[in-house]
């Protein structure tokens, strides 16, 4: 599930490429008065949402129409935000200032068993490998040992695709355990992969981004953007893919990373 805000710019502005922290703060303004969500604001697992960038990308002129999406597997969270944005129409991300003209809800679905399609990351995937995962794949942890990478190692192409896919699966499993449907096995409890095909969107695969996880804290993180092809095997797999659409993939999703869009879908042919 997700909501889309239709935004009208109230002033000219340069596009803020380091919008992550400010956008997260604007979303939290809509949740802070609800104890269900405010009590987990600073928890390790968060409350379960991801969000897009403000799009289309580029210089903003007064009167421009832009859009912003927020996704979550928690219907109550989105209902709370809809009510808030309906009352508080100002939407300001630093110098990017908008008013909310319209709010719409969407429930993208990858389709029944046999459906094929493509998911694309609208924002970069944050994938930092902890020591345990790095050691499982026999990766060089010398930078971690030397304190150069704190306690994590950012994924790079030289590490191979398996650690990336494993990290994505583990983070989605955590979301399943916190906010998913316990009728289904989680993505970490099945042997089959989430995706049939994985293609990088950017030629260089990974790219650095300045990131402010908290006020007065500046970091540079490595991100990657992906195009994921899929064929739905069964209802459990359908649930896993839709959960990824609702929650995003990778780490720090509540900071604006790993937001997914369904860009192509083909339903199975009806049998003769």
UniProtKB/Swiss-Prot annotation:
Location(s) in or outside the cell: Cytoplasm
Keyword ATP-binding: yes or no?
no
Identify the Gene3D superfamilies for this entry.
3.30.70.1900
Gene Ontology molecular functions: endonuclease activity; RNA binding
* Effect recorded for residue 41 to A: About 40% of mature crRNA produced, 20% reduced CRISPR plasmid interference
Q: Which UniProt keywords apply?
A: Antiviral defense, Cytoplasm, Endonuclease, Hydrolase, Nuclease, Plasmid, RNA-binding
Taxonomic superkingdom: Archaea
The positions flagged as active site in the entry are 41 (proton donor)
Give the EC number(s) under which this enzyme is classified. 3.1.-.-
Check the record and name the InterPro entries matching this protein: Cas_Cas6_C (IPR049435), CRISPR-assoc_prot_Cas6 (IPR010156)
Question: What's an example GO BP annotation here?
Answer: defense response to virus
Task: Look up the further comments and give them.
Answer: There are 3 CRISPR RNA loci in this organism and a single cas gene locus. A CRISPR-Cas type I-B system.
* Protein purpose: CRISPR (clustered regularly interspaced short palindromic repeat) is an adaptive immune system that provides protection against mobile genetic elements (viruses, transposable elements and conjugative plasmids). CRISPR clusters contain sequences complementary to antecedent mobile elements and target invading nucleic acids. CRISPR clusters are transcribed and processed into CRISPR RNA (crRNA). Plasmid targeted by CRISPR locus P1 transform wild-type cells very poorly.
Family classification: Belongs to the CRISPR-associated protein Cas6/Cse3/CasE family.
State the name under which the record lists this protein.
CRISPR-associated endoribonuclease Cas6
- Which source organism does the UniProt entry give? Haloferax volcanii (strain ATCC 29605 / DSM 3757 / JCM 8879 / NBRC 14742 / NCIMB 2012 / VKM B-1768 / DS2) (Halobacterium volcanii)
Source taxonomy lineage?
A: Archaea, Methanobacteriati, Methanobacteriota, Stenosarchaea group, Halobacteria
